[in-house]
Structures are given as structure tokens and as C-alpha cells.
Amino acid sequence: MLDLKLLQRSPEVVAKALADRGSSLDMAEFTALDERRRALLAEVEALKGERNKASGEVARMKRAGEDAAPLLERLSGLSDRIKDLDRETEEVKAAVNDWLLAVPNIPDASVPFGRSEADNPEVLRWGEPRAFSFAPKEHWEIGTALGGLDFERAGKLAGSRFAVYRTWAARMERALANFFLDTHVTEHGYVEIIPPFMVNRKTMTGTGQLPKFEEDLFKLEGWDYFLIPTAEVPLTNLHADDVLEEAQLPMGYAAMTPCFRSEAGSYGKDTRGLIRQHQFTKVEMVRFAHPERSFDELEKMRGHAEVLLQRLGLPYRVITLCTGDMGFSSAKTYDIEVWLPGQNAYREISSCSNCGDFQARRAGIRFRPAGGGKPEFAHTLNGSGLAVGRALVAVIENYQQEDGSVVIPEVLRPYMGGMERVTAE
């Protein structure tokens, strides 16, 4: 949620920043609501002052034995009017809040201008894509041939965009998740969390999924619960309505959870394989930072994701999302894209974002400055560390052999009982 004072003070600046990210902003609606809110507050304060003055006069008249009935009637009318105005004020405040909840975050000044993913600048590349002596296959073909992925039975069980993992693929999925979590917890200082996989509407609103993106979510019929699209949602909201101590910052949580997405608007995209599923596993990183140091934390978080790919020996590149390609809650985002030889393309495997105080304002996440003073909003960050299914895709495609087998990266072998290679059953 944007700072109300910023909108009041610099509406043109906000409108320009949001236009840069392709979002139209009806400032006239906000201005009308805000002016009405302020007018109501001013009228209520004036009437309360009048009521207080009249109450004092009634007390004086009673002490003097004078007839205060006319003034008491006036007081009753003032109280009724104040109640009516208070009710209207709350309605207008709710309308302002609803308007604010639908407005995306403002891009940081360091974010490049652009209209689409075609305008995202590349930051760096790591690793050299392997030169194959044969035509590399896509992961779904290899995984099916080796008996590890079963899309046909998944379709029978649930429908399209689901997968059944068997034998080595199930074990590799678990191995990847454990490797990711172990690295984040033991080396990067994250606290491991197992959160609920269902959350309520307030929690979804806190991180920005609601109210705007309800069609992208799975809601439990008859319950006010949603399946989480990412562990960012429960991890960030662990501190909703909390006041942290500045000494606690920065702090980080990591979780491995299933994620559930409707993939609305993705019809026809990545219809085969594991790239775009309704249910997938992801290890998520969430950090809470001091406002003056949150962009340093973003660079650290990106590094925490990159080191996993480096240890797996998977080539990747990092891009900065331009203004027109950013997520709703983000002030700045890096995408990390892993090389998939079967597709002859880099595909996203991690997205690391600094949301500034945007989510903190929605969820009420504050910290108390070390030197005292009024609590301030913390900055929140989130990043994939990593998408487990896509990591499995990358391992299969990059480590495939001409005989159809797949070599297991050395870093995963301790998690897979020393297995070195996957061969046909």
C-alpha cells in the first residue's frame, strides 16, 4: 500500500511512476474521496468542540439553577449529527482504503523504464552452456523415458498442468529442496519455517495477492481460505501487526512448500512438462530489513539464490525487470533465468524482489528504532531459493547424456544415497 501522505503531497509524481509501469491511476476518484474524508473529519472536530463548549455551559446553568432544557436538546442533536458523520467518515475511509489496495507499488528510481519483458536488461551471465554432440531433448521426454515423470496418470488423477513424480525424480525433487534449505539455514542464516499451506483473506491482502488477483488463486469452497501461491504469503505475514526491534533487523525466513496457482491467462503456454503447473514445490526466502539497508539485502538475497545454481553447475543469467514487467508489490525485481538446452532458452527459476514498505503498510509490519521514537514501517523482501520443479528440469536437461541417462550433480549425490546416474529402469 502506498503512503497516503505521498499521494496527497505529490499526486503527479505517483501518477507518473505508475504510468511508467503501465498502470493507469484515477487520481480524480482518490482526490474526491480524500477531500470528502478531510472535510468530514474537520466538521466532526468542529462539532465536537461545539459540543464540549455546550456541555460546559449546561453544567454552569445547572449549578446556577437555570433551565438548561433547550441547550440539552441542542446537545442531543449535536451528538446525533456527530454519530452520523462518524459513520460516513468510516465509509469514506473504507473507500479510500479499497482504492489504495488496488494500486501497485512505485518502481524504485534504479529500475529501468520499459513496457514488456523484451525491455528487461541483462545484468550478468554465469557459466557456459554445454556444447552437446547430439540434439538435446526436453525434460518431459527424458523424465518419461526414464520412468520418473508420469503426466498421463497425473492427468487421470487431476487434469492438465499436474505431474506424478516417481522413483528417482521424486527423490531428486526432495534432494534439491533439502539442499536448498540446508544452504539457506546453515550458511545464509535463515530460520526454517513450515507454515500453513492455506491462509485467510487478510493474509493474502497483506502481501498484495488480494483484492486484485483473486482469479489467480485457488479458494476453498465454503471457507475463507486460499491455497498459498507462494510461501512469501505466510512468511511475510508472520509479523503482521507486529512491532519488531531494530536490533532484530535484518532477519530472514526460509520455507519449502507446495504452491498452488490457477495460471489464469496462461492458456496455451508451456502445456507440456513441469514449467507451468497448478501445483509445484518452491523454497522461498523472505527478509525483513531496515529501510536504509533494504537494497543491500536485495543484493544479498539474489546471491543466496545464485550460489545454489553455481553449486549445481547450471548456467544462468540475471535480468532486472523493467517498469512494465514488475510484479504488483515490487519496488525492484531481479529474475534469475537458468539455461535449458532442450528449449535452447533461459527460463525463470528465481525472482528476488524488494517491496519497500508496500507490504509492511498493508500488513502493519513495523520496527521500533534503536534510539527510541515512533515505530516505522520495515521493508520486506522475497525471493525464490529456488523453484524446485524448475531446478529438476534444469538438472535433467543440462546433465542428459547421449545414451538417455542423466548424470546427477555431485552436490546432490549425498542427498540421493550416493547415486551418480539415472538410467532406464
From Swiss-Prot:
Assembly and binders: Homodimer. The tRNA molecule binds across the dimer.
PANTHER family the record matches: SERINE--TRNA LIGASE, SERYL-TRNA SYNTHETASE
Lineage, broadest ranks: Bacteria, Pseudomonadati, Thermodesulfobacteriota, Desulfovibrionia, Desulfovibrionales
Family that this chain belongs to: Belongs to the class-II aminoacyl-tRNA synthetase family. Type-1 seryl-tRNA synthetase subfamily.
Summary of the function given for this chain in its UniProt record: Catalyzes the attachment of serine to tRNA(Ser). Is also able to aminoacylate tRNA(Sec) with serine, to form the misacylated tRNA L-seryl-tRNA(Sec), which will be further converted into selenocysteinyl-tRNA(Sec).
NCBIfam families: serS
Keywords, alphabetical: Aminoacyl-tRNA synthetase, ATP-binding, Cytoplasm, Ligase, Nucleotide-binding, Protein biosynthesis
Cellular location(s): Cytoplasm
Single GO MF descriptor: serine-tRNA ligase activity
The reaction(s) this protein catalyses: tRNA(Ser) + L-serine + ATP = L-seryl-tRNA(Ser) + AMP + diphosphate + H(+); tRNA(Sec) + L-serine + ATP = L-seryl-tRNA(Sec) + AMP + diphosphate + H(+)
Listed GO CC annotations: cytoplasm
Protein name (Swiss-Prot/TrEMBL): Serine--tRNA ligase
Residues annotated for L-serine binding in this entry: T230, A231, E232, E284, S384
Domain remarks: Consists of two distinct domains, a catalytic core and a N-terminal extension that is involved in tRNA binding.
Keyword ATP-binding: yes
InterPro entries noted in UniProt: aa-tRNA-synt_IIb, aa-tRNA-synth_II, aa-tRNA-synth_II/BPL/LPL, Ser-tRNA-ligase_type_1, Ser-tRNA-synth_1_N, SerRS_1_N_sf, SerRS_core, tRNA-bd_arm
Primary localisation category: cytoplasm
Sites where the protein binds ATP: R261, S262, E263, E348, I349, S350, S351
Gene: serS
Source organism (scientific name): Nitratidesulfovibrio vulgaris (strain DSM 19637 / Miyazaki F)
One Pfam family linked to the record: tRNA-synt_2b
GO biological process, one term: selenocysteine biosynthetic process
Class of enzymatic activity (EC top level): ligase
Superkingdom per UniProt: Bacteria
Pathway participation: Aminoacyl-tRNA biosynthesis; selenocysteinyl-tRNA(Sec) biosynthesis; L-seryl-tRNA(Sec) from L-serine and tRNA(Sec): step 1/1
EC assignment: 6.1.1.11
